[in-house]
Amino acid sequence: MQSVLVLDFGSQYTQLIARRIRELGIYSEILPYSTTPEAIREHDPKAIILSGGPTSVYGESAILPHPGIFSLGLPILGICYGLQAIANHFGGAVESSSKQEFGRAKILVDRTEGHESMLFKDIPDSDVWMSHGDKVTRMPEGFQITASSGNSEMCAIESFGPKAALKIYGLQFHPEVQHTLYGKQLLSNFLINIAGIRPDWSSKSFIEHQIEDIRQRADKGTVICGISGGVDSTVAAVLVSKAIGKQLHCVFVDNGLLRKNEARKVMEFLKPLGLNITLADSADLFLGRLKGVASPEKKRKIIGRTFIRVFEEHINEEKFLVQGTLYPDVIESQSVKGPSETIKSHHNVGGLPKRMKLKLIEPLRELFKDEVRAVGRELGIPEDILMRHPFPGPGLAVRVLGSLTRERLDILREADEIYIDELKSSGLYQQVWQAFSVLLPVQSVGVMGDKRTYENVLALRAVESTDGMTADWAHLPHDFLAKVSNRIINEVRGINRVAYDISSKPPATIEWE
């Protein structure tokens, strides 16, 4: 399978680059900006893309690619900071721009004789998405301008003449962002027409590759999988089961942090999938360890450690642990690919004990949620399982803000069931990416039955997204919200006020904790 490497310099859009490449049917992988030429050769890519980034190539904190990558003989496309890194390496100049560009801009493609670029084949002058404060001010020798904007004369450059064979291209704008009208066509021109890559990546090929990899890693060893009934862990379990069959033992842990009747429902709809599942009732253990803990980070780490301990109690000779970790989990947990800032740890990444006895198998680690669902369909998993809304690994622990009690968990369960049931009966459930309720550590004054109340505040959350990396708050009908609020306040003892969260990601995250 032919592939592309994306070297990450810390851009918020790096993962979008990988997604857009995969949408073209080409496998992509993200590696740190500092990856050596030797390591790149081991991956055997057909092209390299340099991502954008938050630093300046001329600053003391500049992060630069290994100079040897430009001698590998591979086509290279630099995006934003990647363009500036190319210009810097080949002797050009990059300076702070007196007029920064953030948002839409129009580029003019140079079509004069001798300047025609394969990169801009069939691409007219059009709107692109800019996000930069620096710009190239002196062209590196052996390069030519192929497009410009009102603020960036050297908006697109490429090697030409004696250096044409290098096939090195640079763009000041972001082709991976949807606001760049011909961004996908531009990436296709680079990868297929210039690099000559054959589109051969699909859900089917991903499954075949993972099955082979899982069999090699697990060999004849036994494997344990913590399964929650959510999309991620279910797809991961079915994929691993397809690879090693009876070597896989699944454990569904009732940690006391699940939604109403979740344990029973999960066991019922997973049964037809033929998985070997054991139910572990560990609610007392989890809630005991979480007693008095208010910090969301501490909650996540305690839950991660406790999950592993529970699994270890259910293993005999198992050597591996399967997790449904996804790419957004990894990105938000730690800067594993580049200098991006850690946002929060995930219980199934940063919360794991450093000295756990089990080795990890994470077959979905490089996939986004929509790709996981596509893999699930290829595996034959029913649509009603695949289209369930994401549910966090720590469960309701991160939806009951502050310290946990059984009473507060039960209040949230009752309210959330009403919210989700109303979404489904109104035909809105599948129109949003994720919806849930959050019990706040806040109380408010109210009046019920001519009596003063001082009870809990509940927040409703619903967002629209495709991959969980960015999200917009869902504009649910006011009549619907009024109905849900009225039902919750009247039917759930302990809540006298309901609010609706209208924050997008960024700046907020989807979950509150």
UniProtKB/Swiss-Prot annotation:
Entries under PROSITE patterns matching the protein: GATASE_TYPE_1, GMPS_ATP_PPASE
| Residues in Glutamine amidotransferase type-1 domain copies | 3-200
Give the matching InterPro entries.
Class_I_gatase-like, GATASE, GMP_synth_C, GMP_synth_GATase, GMP_synthase, GMPS_ATP_PPase_dom, NAD/GMP_synthase, Rossmann-like_a/b/a_fold
Biological pathway: Purine metabolism; GMP biosynthesis; GMP from XMP (L-Gln route): step 1/1
Q: Give an example GO molecular function.
A: GMP synthase activity
**Catalytic activity from the UniProt record:** XMP + L-glutamine + ATP + H2O = GMP + L-glutamate + AMP + diphosphate + 2 H(+)
Write out the catalytic residues in the record. Answer: 80 (nucleophile), 174, 176
Q: Do the record's keywords include Nucleotide-binding?
A: yes
Q: Which residues form the GMPS ATP-PPase domain?
A: 201-388
Q: Is Nucleotide-binding one of the keywords UniProt gives this record? A: yes
Family matches, as Gene3D superfamilies: 3.30.300.10, 3.40.50.880, HUPs
**CDD domains cross-referenced by the UniProt entry:** GATase1_GMP_Synthase, GMP_synthase_C
| Keyword line | ATP-binding, Glutamine amidotransferase, GMP biosynthesis, Ligase, Nucleotide-binding, Purine biosynthesis
Query: Which domain of life does this protein belong to?
Result: Bacteria
Q: Which EC main class describes this enzyme?
A: ligase
Disulfide-linked positions:
none
The UniProt record gives the binding positions of ATP as: 228-234
Q: Which SUPFAM superfamilies match?
A: Adenine nucleotide alpha hydrolases-like (SSF52402), Class I glutamine amidotransferase-like (SSF52317), GMP synthetase C-terminal dimerisation domain (SSF54810)
**Gene Ontology CC annotations of this record:** cytosol
Q: What does this protein do?
A: Catalyzes the synthesis of GMP from XMP.
Subunit structure as annotated in this protein's UniProt entry: Homodimer.
What name does UniProt use for this protein?
A: GMP synthase [glutamine-hydrolyzing]
Q: Which organism is it from?
A: Chlorobium luteolum (strain DSM 273 / BCRC 81028 / 2530)
Q: Which gene encodes it?
A: guaA
